[in-house]
């Protein structure tokens, strides 16, 4: 499964303790701010960060990754076996799951169900209700 807009903060957590292969090019493809946060007060910071990142990339500097903020979104790919994916999807959509993880894993789980419809009977998708 893959996402084209996973924030670095989420990637950092999802990348831990998981089986399979994970890949991200660490190229910024957007920036996540919660809907209730007004982007306007942060526009100058985000513009400066974008300018710095572009300048470092134009120089082919590997240091560009240090210009990425935790809200920077990047493509993320994760290949794994079905049993490990099901475990992760149930865990990340279950009780107390972070709403962003739950949204990402719910979408991936629905794509999985489209390919393996018989799995619906034995895979439990949670509702990410708070503990």
Regions found by a protein language model. Give the residues of each.
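Family-specific signature for flavin-dependent thymidylate synthase
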Residues: 2-131
């Amino acid at each position: 499964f893959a996402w084209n807009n996973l924030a670095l903060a989420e990637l950092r957590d999802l990348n831990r303790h998981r089986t399979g292969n994970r890949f991200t090019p660490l190229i910024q493809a957007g920036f996540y701010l919660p809907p209730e946060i007004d982007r306007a007060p942060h526009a100058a910071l985000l513009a400066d960060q974008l300018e710095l990142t572009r300048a470092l990339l134009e120089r082919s500097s590997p240091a560009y990754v240090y210009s990425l903020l935790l809200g920077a979104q990047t493509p993320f790919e994760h290949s794994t076996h079905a049993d490990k994916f099901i475990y992760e999807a149930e865990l990340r959509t279950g009780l107390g799951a972070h709403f962003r993880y739950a949204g990402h894993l719910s979408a991936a789980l629905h794509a999985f169900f489209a390919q393996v419809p018989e799995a619906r009977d034995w895979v439990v998708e949670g509702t990410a209700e708070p503990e």
